[in-house]
């Protein structure tokens, strides 16, 4: 093994690199715009997104339990149209229904139902086993209340256009499939329109659980849910901001993906600000990213900060109250992130085979000694980047390109006061997700006790 030693005089190096170091590889082959990804982002069409939104509205309802046999109305007509759109985009897209038979249960599944997710797979060329999922739910809901004010969940055929929730996400996934399917990527891209979200994340839960059982390697899940409005019910507007929700804790796979979305999204769509929200979702709400997080995959939700709650789950969630221009901006962020990940090398492994972090205090006992593994490095791998931040900082604060090393030592830096990670970069500057060094949870201890021994004379 080779080693680079960087002497850091104080932790202020996170903000001011005044320490003495061995020179890293130069120039740094990352942090720049790829012309191919730039073309992909530019190809996203607001007009096509608007056309998709109008078509989805014309189905009148996409309720999961609506009539699946009607040719122009309801969930069946909608999923057939989505299926055919995927097929039209490219012969390289492998399009299928992911079908489940779900029993009547709970409040919202008022009868047995055949549930169909619509899936389009664009196989990767070099690492086809590694998957990037771009998804949204295509079902809709309009709530009807009875005379007593309680929700009548049996009303499955009422007008429920669902343009913002979630025709907007569905239109984005369709447009992303159209554009990205014209290119080749090292990893596999999977475009999914989920059903049953409004009944409790049913379609995504069943898909994520199946993926885990099958041992699928899902590197990232970008869930788009409610990305179609840029004016809130109180008149507030932030049409150049998108929220990205991610799962705790601070260095979870989900949180690393959120940081990646911010970094790459703002690089390729500089007119937008990606605002990371460190919660799994909004209060009282849920999304199709959550089942993937439950299965240990990195998943995030992209959503508008400007939702009009008066239109939520109602007959007024129409195209007239939507903003295709805002949806297009969020779709471009998706395009940049998905393409960059699909072209990037795989993340390095920073744990042992038993899951222990490959981090220590070095020979001095007062250093940060980082190690990582890559069993099969890509032929175009340029090297690795060590990233670090204060434990209280929301995002990475310093990066050091170390080249084709598999360990790195920072003298005088406490591993207890700084969070570290490593990412891989290729010669074209494509960056992997960061693999963070995480302290494994300390197991809860239990101790047996007994009654005090009896002593004579007491």
Where are these regions (language model features)?
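Extracellular fibronectin type III
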Residues: 427-458
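A non-catalytic alpha/beta surface segment that caps or lines the substrate-entry region
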Residues: 25, 48-123, 273-275
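Alpha-helical metal-binding/catalytic segments enriched in His/Glu/Asp
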Residues: 120, 134-135, 139-140, 145-200, ...
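His/Asp/Glu-rich mid-to-C-terminal helical/loop segments that flank catalytic regions of hydrolases
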Residues: 307-354
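Short beta-strand segments within Ig-like beta-sandwich modules, predominantly Fibronectin type-III
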Residues: 398-405
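Metal-dependent peptidase/peptidase-like ectodomains
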Residues: 194-291, 295-301
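Beta-strand-rich modules
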Residues: 410-431
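Conserved aromatic anchor
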Residues: 366-380
């Amino acid at each position: 093994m080779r080693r680079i030693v960087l002497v850091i005089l104080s932790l202020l190096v996170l903000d001011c690199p005044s320490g003495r170091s061995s020179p890293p590889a130069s120039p740094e082959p990352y942090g720049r715009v790829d012309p191919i990804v730039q073309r992909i982002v530019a190809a996203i069409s607001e007009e096509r997104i608007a056309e998709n939104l109008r078509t989805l509205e014309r189905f009148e309802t996409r309720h999961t339990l609506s009539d699946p046999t009607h040719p122009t109305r309801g969930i069946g007509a909608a999923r057939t149209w989505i299926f055919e759109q995927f097929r039209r985009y490219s012969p390289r897209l492998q399009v299928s229904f992911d079908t489940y038979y779900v029993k009547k249960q709970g409040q919202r599944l008022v009868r047995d139902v055949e549930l169909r997710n619509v899936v389009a797979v664009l196989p990767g060329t070099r690492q086809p086993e590694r998957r990037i999922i771009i998804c949204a739910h295509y079902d809709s809901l309009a709530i009807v209340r009875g005379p007593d004010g309680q929700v009548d969940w049996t009303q499955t055929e009422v007008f429920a256009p669902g343009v913002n929730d979630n025709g907007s996400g569905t239109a984005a996934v369709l447009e992303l499939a159209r554009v990205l399917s014209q290119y080749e990527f090292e990893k596999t891209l999977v475009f999914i329109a989920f059903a049953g979200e409004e009944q409790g994340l049913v379609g995504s839960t069943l898909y994520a659980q199946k993926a885990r059982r099958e041992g699928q390697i899902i590197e990232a899940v970008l869930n788009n849910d409610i990305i179609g409005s840029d004016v809130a019910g109180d008149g507030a507007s932030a049409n150049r901001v998108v929220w990205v929700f991610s799962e705790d804790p601070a260095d979870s796979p989900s949180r690393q993906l959120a940081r990646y979305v911010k970094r790459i999204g703002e690089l390729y769509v500089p007119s937008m600000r990606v605002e990371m929200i460190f919660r799994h979702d909004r209060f009282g709400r849920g999304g199709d990213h959550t089942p993937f997080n439950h299965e240990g995959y990195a998943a995030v939700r992209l959503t508008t900060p400007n939702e009009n709650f008066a239109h939520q789950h109602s007959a007024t969630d129409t195209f007239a109250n939507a903003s295709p221009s805002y949806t297009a901006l969020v779709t471009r962020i998706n395009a940049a992130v998905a393409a960059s990940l699909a072209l990037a090398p795989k993340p390095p492994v920073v744990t042992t085979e038993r899951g222990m972090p490959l981090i220590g205090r070095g020979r001095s006992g007062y250093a940060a000694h980082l190690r990582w593994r890559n069993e099969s490095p890509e032929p175009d791998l340029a090297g690795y980047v060590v990233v670090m931040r204060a434990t209280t900082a929301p995002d990475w604060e310093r990066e050091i390109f170390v080249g084709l090393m598999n360990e790195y030592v920072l003298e005088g830096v406490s591993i207890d006061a700084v969070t570290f990670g490593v990412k891989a970069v290729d010669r074209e500057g494509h960056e992997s997700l960061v693999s963070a060094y995480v302290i494994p949870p300390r197991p809860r201890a239990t101790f047996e006790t007994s009654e005090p021994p009896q002593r004579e004379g007491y």
